[in-house]
Amino acid sequence: MEELQGYLEEDRSRQQQFLYPLLFQEYIYVFAYDHGLNSSIFYEPQNSLGYDNKFSSVLVKRLIIRMYQKNYLIYSVNDIYQNIFVGHNNYFYFNFFSQILSEGFAVIVEIPFSLQLISSLEEKEIPKSHNLQSSHSIFPFLEDKLLHLNYLSDILIPYPVHMEILVQMLQSWIQDVLSLHLLQFFLHEYYNWNSLIIPKKSIYVFSKENKRLFWFLYNLYIYEYEFLLVFPCKQSSFLRLISSGVLLERIHFYVKIEHLGVCRIFCQKTLWIFKDPFIHYIRYQGKSILGSRGTHFLMKKWKYHLVNFWQYYFHFWSQPYRIDIKKLSNYSFYFLGYFSSVQINSSMVRNQMLENSFLMYTLTKKFDTIIPIIPLIRSLSKAQFCTVSGYPISKPIWTDLADCDIINRFGRICRKLSHYYSGSSKKQSLYRMKYILRLSCARTLARKHKSSARSFLQRLSSGLLEEFFTEEEQVIFLIFPKIISFYLYGSYRERIWYLDIIRINDLVNCLLVTT
């Protein structure tokens, strides 16, 4: 137990006690900007507020001055409650101040964690490599590891129903009681106010209106969840040498005393699953993958272990159907915009030895990735590039732009999709996406000039085709000199993983969320 507590104290030795005064300093945003923390919840245009995203940091910096007045926010909230039926202006002001407080707290609390991350990287002499941040960097790992695994659990990570659970986790990191009380007051008033307008306000809506604060609390929850999941696996070599009582404390060191009887039985039954030496864990956004070389029975043990773990540690129930167990040789799984699978190919070889000949059958495994064409067409349809059936249509909202801007926008989307889906082993779906975007571009130009799409294709066929393919071909040529072209019939099965994809295209990101 002392070893584990020391491990935790080492990570949490930088607890801050000065956060609350910083909330009322307008120049804290300058300090935040110096540490690369200037992203804001206002990065999307807020039509209700009437501000553009270019002035988001200035907006928050100026509005924080109004919080200097004593109990100004509390009086404003009480005044809103007393005049709730006056009109929509009350909701405007409450939403306005809630975003100020949410943004201010998120910026303040990110600073010590950012400094801790930078110092830890410097102490461990870990180089800052953008290649490791690429979403494509995970696929070579999958290609190398999944070939040796048998089963895979596709996990949809649950999140707490109430934000108070996330605040309780934050208490173990930050000792500033005033800041935590202010955050609890904000969340309490936020839910009370919205319950008067929209009954049963969900955490999903809170995540949309307070993105920065929500993602900070959510990432903290993911860190706690993964730490408690990975730590027993790392310590599995010591499990046979310690008593069951220490094992109970090692795994459930934060569990409440009333749950000890339940957890003791639970640990004794599930502890042996951590001894699997071929377990692999991968996470992205709200999904994770747990792969193992073991049996289906072992994966079911992992499934019920996770369900009970979320229930007894985080105090919320997770439905078992959120964890789907699949056999890699029979099923494919969806991850990061690709349908991935492990295919088994058989080959026959005839061997001749003197006068005798015999046949040998060999089985080889291959990691395969394909583009999910139907969900991607649905995403293009939602963006008004085509119909639900995949028929290209014009983009009316872009008809007011110049011709070169229209072509550049379509070309940029096409190149980004080609860039991201270059790892597909079958390119037919990628070519279909390019065809839809190319014809949608022609129809948009034709609608602007009140002409037909066929005439534009005849006049601009070569130029339009070059706009959609040239830049992508140059990038591939620089990275892979042996590849000459990337046209319709070139590099048909060549899979390329780029290590510069830090941000996913909006169409792909929409696909990740809706699938």
Curated annotation (Swiss-Prot):
Organism domain of life: Eukaryota
Any one GO CC term of the record: chloroplast
HAMAP family, alphabetized: MatK
Pfam assignment, any one: MatK_N
RNA-binding listed as a keyword: yes
One Gene Ontology biological process: mRNA processing
Upper lineage: Eukaryota, Viridiplantae, Streptophyta, Embryophyta, Tracheophyta
Any coiled-coil regions, as ranges: none
Functional summary from the UniProt entry: Usually encoded in the trnK tRNA gene intron. Probably assists in splicing its own and other chloroplast group II introns.
Annotated InterPro entries: Domain_X, Maturase_MatK, Maturase_MatK_N
Keywords: Chloroplast, mRNA processing, Plastid, RNA-binding, tRNA processing
UniProt-annotated location(s): Plastid, Chloroplast
Gene name of the record: matK
Protein's recorded name: Maturase K
